[in-house]
Amino acid sequence: MSKVATMPSTTLGRFWRKWRFHLNILLVIIPLAFMPKYFHQVALFRGDSGLGEREVGEVQVGPWSLRLAELFEEPPRLEGPAGYMKSFNAALCAACLDEVKATYLRIGKPRSLRAAGAIFFGSPYRMGASVPIPVRTKADAELWITMEGWDGSMHQASIPLAQASPATLTWLNRQGVKP
């Protein structure tokens, strides 16, 4: 009969054998703490909870209109070299679905269609755009919406930034106007 040589157990080995079940349970439970935030974002991205966290309302742009909403009701996020960005969602009116070619969003009045701002992407029922927020933006700035029709017509409207995103205005006031 052969004798089996066993190595003496170490403190770490004894600890692992005693607590491995509990540690594995923790590995399962810890991700559950993040589930409410995950389900909130899934409902937001899927559209179950509306266009965004904060609905701005209906904005009339020439003969057309759109519903505008902040995706997240929070200050702009730093997106690396692009700077601070703020995300908005929009939905075109039922009457203008076939008439609107493109919709743009920008802080400050656009000089021309070439500088119209960030283009909305997605279906006309739920479009999204991320607008760069310059640090030097003044508190009385306006958010300009430019809509281009298939017939070549272009219409613009503006709403105060304070109405479109109070969180961004608070963030700008905290930053202070820089020269």
Task: List each language-model region with its residue ranges.
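N-terminal Lys/Arg-rich, disordered targeting/topogenic segments
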Residues: 1-15
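Non-transmembrane interaction and regulatory regions of membrane-associated proteins
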Residues: 86-89, 101, 114, 120-125, ...
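Extracytoplasmic/periplasmic copper-protein system
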Residues: 54-58, 161-179
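Hydrophobic membrane-insertion alpha-helices, especially the h-region
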Residues: 14-39
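Transition segment at domain starts
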Residues: 41-85, 116-120
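Extracytoplasmic/periplasmic/luminal assembly and interaction segments
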Residues: 67-113
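Short, solvent-exposed, Trp/other aromatic-anchored flexible loops in extracytoplasmic proteins
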Residues: 120-144, 150
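Short acidic/polar inter-strand loop motif in beta-rich domains
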Residues: 149-156
